[in-house]
Amino acid sequence: MLFCKNCGSQNNEGAKFCKQCGTPIGGGSKQANQETASTAETRQAPRKPIPKKTIILWSSIAAACVILFAAYKTGAYFTSKDRLVDKFEQAVNDGDQDQIATLLTPVNDNLKLTKNNVKPFLTYLKDHPDKKDELFASLRDETAQKDIVYAEKDGKSLLVFDHYDLKVAPVYFEVSSNYKNTDLYVNKEEAGSVKKADQAQTLGPYIPGEYTVSAKLKNDVVDLVKKEDIQAIGDSSFRVDLSLEADDVTFSLANDIKSGKGDLLINGKSIHKDPFKSVTYGPLLTDGSMTASVEAEFPWGKTKTAGVPIDDKEMELTLIPDQDTQEQIMNTIVKTTKQYSKALSDGNTAQMTEASANWKAETKDTVDSMKSADSYLKDRYLETDFDLDTFALSQKNDGTWQVSVTGKELHQSSSYNDYTKSEMTDDSPSYEYLLSYDKKQKKWIFEDAESTFESAGTNIKKIKNDKPETYTSAWAGSKNKGSESSASGDVTDEQVTLFMGSYLQSQADAVNQNNFSLMEDSLEKGSSLYSDQQHLVSKLNKEGTTEDFNNYEVKSWSQNGSAITIKTYEEFYITKSGGSPKLRTYNWTYTGVVKNGRIYLTSIQ
């Protein structure tokens, strides 16, 4: 019997096609039977299976190979030069000083890198980005020359991988200075001191970078510092000369100081040396920025003289009175000048209370000479400008202390005779005044005033005559009646013009200095103008307004008995607080009274 392979129906022996589905079945039956038999034989003899242990063994070996290969690759990556350079670059870009100190290996074991001492290196790279780029390019280039940091192979890691270090060579500073025991600093950290003047001291090692090397020397009166910024790159040693710009200075007093005992002060501090003997002290600056003064017992008390700028290695000190003593001296000179002006008009030298007998005698001789020559003087003393830089103390052979100072006076004066008219003009003579200290009277006495050239100094103090008066020679002759005020108190064109000029200037000064007394002697007390101007001075000063008197003109004036009317044109530059000067012009009519030849204003409109 044959069975159809397609539908499984039974067919007769020898059939070629299935009677059920028509599938050919003829001769293939024998082949099929043979295949079936072969398959049966195969099933009867199966292949022997691989042992489980063998499978596990080979699987383990394969896995181990994979792991070892991966581990090798991982180890090679983590120990590679490129990764080390990448980490270093990242640390630099992040400013990670701890990481930089860890990654760098000093060539010299004496250089210990820390978070703090790698900062100069990092600063250099930040300040020079082009150099930073060059550095990392050289680290990655196998053929590049060594830069300040370079990669160097140093043995093996885990006996397999190449190990690299980032090497850095240290730098040193060869520092010298001109004074022994000068302290040396590198980036504000003390690094040593000078053992011998001008002999170099080696400071280091340091990591390459940007540094400030400084030398400091401090004594009782001076703190000297010299600094130099160093870019310590490209070499191993850097020479730095930090010579301090200072000198040992020898002090002595001027030859006209006979005796004394005191204390030499530098910048107001005692160095415990007697200046009345030659003294050498240092180091000190000689550029004029430091001063020397003397504290001593003078007849007028223990005082400290004014400071003299130290501008040389050999200083001959001029003793300069202290500020209070200067004020006393200048006030004495101004008072004597006022008394001298009056004495020249009447010959009365007894009222010269601050003058020496010799100066009184000279004044008397001047008056007698004018009388004998029929010469007259009309004078109004206004002020003196003192050159404070010309003050100097000295001693006479007998030990008497004297002082000299120069000043320029301002007068309105006229010298005339019986045949000329008196015309007052500004006169500005310059004098060198000499005063002596009187121990018995305990005050300064005016000795002399010698004509001199006008001082070119800029340290000037102006002292005004608080109550200027015009004095005329009492012996003036009758041939010049037109030049004098009449007995009735009539005033002249000249008087009116000079009066108004003085009044307007004093008005500006009063406003600027908030000092009404500077102008009140030109005003009638109790008048409306007196009260108004007193209020105005205070008001303008509080507002911060200032006045600069520029020009004026007396357009006309008239006098009727003691009453006077004056019409003026005036120019002032007015500056309000925070503003700029602006020119203001005014036309005023003043009224006033004349008393004993003097004008006193009472109102303005």
Swiss-Prot record:
Q: How does it sit in the membrane?
A: Single-pass membrane protein
InterPro entries, per the entry:
NTF2_YvbJ, TcaA_2nd, TcaA_4th, Zinc_ribbon_dom
Q: Which UniProt keywords apply?
A: Cell membrane, Membrane, Transmembrane, Transmembrane helix
Q: A cellular component term (GO) from this record?
A: plasma membrane
Primary localization: membrane
Any stretches that span the bilayer, and where are they? 56-78
Does the record carry Cytoplasm as a key word? no
Which Pfam families does the annotation name? NTF2_YvbJ (PF25155), TcaA_2nd (PF22813), TcaA_3rd_4th (PF22820), TcaA_5th (PF22819), Zn_Ribbon_1 (PF13240)
What protein name is recorded for this chain? Uncharacterized membrane protein YvbJ
Q: Which organism is it from?
A: Bacillus subtilis (strain 168)
Upper lineage is: Bacteria, Bacillati, Bacillota, Bacilli, Bacillales
